[in-house]
């Protein structure tokens, strides 16, 4: 009877993941979050040993949390970005003029290349 009970739960999740492949990808997101808190609570002293390990997953967490608040903050930085863009555009125009002279020189070398 014990073996049957153990076999039941093991077979249950198997068909579950197979029938729901999309859910698997969604679960991965929640899994990584769970894994983080699990690994931190499960390996408190180990956290100092695998220093290079957690840092790789660490940046992923702030990225996710930054995405949500970054949307509203982006709107505020939009005008700032526009100002920098305008400055860059005017600079680019001057560079483009210079590039045109370069292009004329390149044309002669381009003929040779052809």
From Swiss-Prot:
Changing residue 24 to Q: 50% loss of zinc binding. Keywords: Chromosome, Developmental protein, Differentiation, DNA-binding, Metal-binding, Nucleosome core, Nucleus, Phosphoprotein, Spermatogenesis, Zinc. Residues 90-114 have a biased composition (Basic residues). A motif (Nuclear localization signal) lies at residues 87-95. InterPro entries: TP2. It comes from the Eukaryota. Belongs to the nuclear transition protein 2 family. Residues 16-25 have a biased composition (Low complexity). Changing residue 101 to A: Slight decrease in phosphorylation. Changing residue 109 to A: Large decrease in phosphorylation. GO terms for molecular function: DNA binding; zinc ion binding. Plays a key role in the replacement of histones to protamine in the elongating spermatids of mammals. In condensing spermatids, loaded onto the nucleosomes, where it promotes the recruitment and processing of protamines, which are responsible for histone eviction. GO terms for cellular component: male germ cell nucleus; nucleolus; nucleosome; nucleus. One of its GO terms (biological process) is sperm DNA condensation. The modification Phosphothreonine is found at residue 101. It is found in: Nucleus; Nucleus, Nucleolus; Chromosome. Zn(2+) binds at residues 12, 14, 16, 24, 29, 31, 35, 38. Changing residue 16 to Q: 50% loss of zinc binding. The modification Phosphoserine is found at residue 109. Testis. This is Nuclear transition protein 2.
């Amino acid at each position: 009877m014990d073996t049957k009970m153990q076999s039941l739960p093991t077979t249950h999740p198997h068909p579950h993941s197979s029938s729901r492949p999309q859910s698997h990808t969604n679960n991965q997101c929640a899994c990584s979050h769970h894994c983080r808190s699990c690994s931190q609570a499960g390996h408190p002293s180990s956290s100092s040993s695998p220093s290079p390990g957690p840092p790789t997953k660490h940046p992923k967490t702030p990225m996710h949390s930054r995405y949500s608040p970054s949307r509203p903050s982006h709107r505020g930085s939009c005008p700032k970005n526009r100002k920098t863009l305008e400055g860059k555009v005017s600079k680019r125009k001057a560079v483009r003029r210079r590039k045109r002279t370069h292009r004329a020189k390149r044309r002669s070398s381009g003929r040779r290349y052809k």
